Amino acid sequence: TKRLESVNVKSTSDNRLNFRNTLFTSSAMKTCIGGVILYDETIRQEDNSKKIPEIISQNGTVPGIKVDTGAKVLANSSEEKITEGLDGLRERLKDYYNLGARFTKWRGVYSIADKYPSKLAISSNAHALARYAALVQEAGMVPIIEPEVLMDGSHSAEICYTKTSEVIKKCYEELISFKIDLEGTILKPNMILPGTNSDQKISSTEIAELTLKCLKESVPNEVSGIAFLSGGQTEIQATENLNQINLMNKSNFIFTYSYGRALQQSALKHWSKNINDTTGTQDVFNHRAKMCTLAAKGEWTNNLEKN
């Protein structure tokens, strides 16, 4: 709803389905996209009597589902958030599996400020992520673990590094205590960046260095898949930084992308001007997906953006 309203398109069920289906039937789905994280509404939608997960699967892509119910105010730390959605999750997971989902996503969210994230927020969200992951693996699906340290604020990249390390280490401490099979999980972290209001100027190389150092020190070796969130970066920034991380990667980790805005925004803007221009919208989306996929191999250059 927010995405459509941001480009002045009325957020009706039909319009949401139109945009989603435009992306889901693009050629990039076959060549670039490995999985799609759906919302509860989307996984139940149909287009021409075909369920959305079926359309996605037919294009060689795996349907997944966001299963948390959002971040609420954390008791005894009202400036912070705790993600909810554990109640009834076991039953919902059975339903989602039957609807075609094969992986899931749960997002913990953390703010950086003088005294935040607090130990309470870090431990509460890590515990919730571990309980979620245990239920998902029990249901025969792959859990995406998403502890997002937000870019909001004036903090430096070095502070982001310290706080993100603390958050991720606590997540794995809880995941291990819940006997999670780490090989059957995917981590969706933020990159190490200065806050959006920070004066710090930092290169893509420095971002990659800090991000790689943080993850090598905080993530167990059994975790093979790491898919970055874009977290408010522009399309080009998110692509360039992912590319640099892969160029400098000497670990066994596979680094890819799990982008929302940084994958869809240009396509959404194009579509909003004429929601029936399926081909034009798909061309824009195909280009962005190709750029991100090249970056996931360390093969992107800025010159390719002009073509």
What are these regions (language model features)?
Residues 1-99, 112, 200, 204-210, ...:
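Alpha/beta catalytic barrel-like cores
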Residues 12, 106, 145, 187, ...:
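Conserved, mostly hydrophobic/aromatic
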Residues 36, 104, 143-144, 185, ...:
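Hydrophobic residues within beta-strands of alpha/beta enzymes
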Residues 40, 108, 189:
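Residues that line or immediately flank small-molecule/substrate-binding pockets and catalytic motifs
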Residues 62, 142, 184-186, 225:
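Proline-centered loop/turn at the N-terminus of a beta-strand
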Residues 69, 110, 149, 191-193:
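Short, histidine-centered active-site or binding-site loop motifs used for metal coordination
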Residues 89-175:
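Helix-rich catalytic cores of soluble enzyme domains
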Residues 151, 155-222:
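Catalytic core of soluble alpha/beta enzymes
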